[in-house]
Amino acid sequence: MLADYISRAIQNHTDCNVICDHYQKDELSEVIRRVRKWQFRDGIELMCSEEIETAVQTGNEQCPEQWIVWTVTGDKAKTVSPQHKEFFSLCQQGYWLKMQLA
């Protein structure tokens, strides 16, 4: 289940290793991009792509917009369902994980 892998990656669980962590700040477009990739002991590879706007926030937002895309990659990708999940904020991601792992 994808939610289980996402949760373990976020928590830096001992059964997964970060194999890529690329951070890029584009001053012209005011966007921060981050791509991370994990490999789990069972051979599953998980990639997270994030985009965060660096424009000044109003402070009224409890959960600012942040594009988050999780994708299962590698040879064993078909064993995980769903293989792809997108969120528009950390709050939405947190709620989805909470509901999936309940």
Name what the model sees in each region:
Residues 1-102:
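Cysteine-centric segments in proteins
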